[in-house]
Amino acid sequence: MTQDEMKQAVARAAIEYVVPGEIIGVGTGSTANFFIDELGKIKDRIKGAVASSEATAQRLKSHGIAVFDLNEIDAMSVYIDGADEITAQGAMIKGGGAALTREKIVASVAKQFVCIADGSKLVDLLGNFPLPVEVIPMAQAVVARKLAALGGEPRLRLKDGKPLVTDNGCFIIDVLGLKIQDPAELEAQINNIVGVVTVGLFARRGADIALLGTAEGVKRLTF
């Protein structure tokens, strides 16, 4: 199977976690896009979705799926999203698509987090993928120095030669060179830096289930 075929397979498998008649949380990224396309096929079975980014909201709407503001609901049965890296314990790095803050907010409301990814995303140790940190623009340099003090190499994420601006009007610093032994501890440590909006470590609220695409089919992990 190609990488896209693996993503397609896990997107299909994730449909079984969709509760009929409810509002579900939907993530951002290439694998989440495959899931949205599958969700469009059963849109009449759900009430709608909460999107973790403007891009996801637009894709959901293009399929005729109602998009709800998170402030309109109290709870969701499930949040379905991809990951840039995931461990066998369900800790993840997310934020390659620059939607980490909204992803973390929506995931916090869901009773269950289902991660969908191709099998290459399963790792023994997080950190080979650069760790995204969303920051208030005026604090960019201050935060970068503190991230460097943690042993990483911070780089401001650019788009067309200018700082990428998130849906929240913030910047992203990608931290290279980290080998993350204790994801939950590092998540708390970085989140405590003044000027950080959030870090793309999902360890304190990690995945409950992972659907991983492999050459042999979809592998399911429960945490």
Curated annotation (Swiss-Prot):
Chain positions recorded as substrate binding sites: 28-31, 81-84, 94-97, 121
Pathway it works in: Carbohydrate degradation; pentose phosphate pathway; D-ribose 5-phosphate from D-ribulose 5-phosphate (non-oxidative stage): step 1/1
Transmembrane segments: none
InterPro entries: NagB/RpiA_transferase-like, Ribose5P_isomerase_typA_subgr, Ribose5P_isomerase_type_A
Origin: domain of life: Bacteria
Keywords in alphabetical order: Isomerase
Active site positions: 103 (proton acceptor)
Gene Ontology CC entries for this record: cytosol
Enzyme class: isomerase
EC number(s) given by UniProt: 5.3.1.6
Record has Isomerase as a keyword: yes
MF terms (GO), sorted A to Z: ribose-5-phosphate isomerase activity
GO biological process: D-ribose metabolic process; pentose-phosphate shunt, non-oxidative branch
Any one Pfam family match given in the protein's UniProt record, by short name: Rib_5-P_isom_A
Catalytic activity line of the entry: aldehydo-D-ribose 5-phosphate = D-ribulose 5-phosphate
UniProt-listed NCBIfam families: PRK00702.1, rpiA
SUBUNIT field: Homodimer.
Functional description taken from the UniProt entry: Catalyzes the reversible conversion of ribose-5-phosphate to ribulose 5-phosphate.
Family in the record: Belongs to the ribose 5-phosphate isomerase family.
Protein known as: Ribose-5-phosphate isomerase A
Organism from which the protein derives: Herminiimonas arsenicoxydans
Species lineage: Bacteria, Pseudomonadati, Pseudomonadota, Betaproteobacteria, Burkholderiales
Gene: rpiA
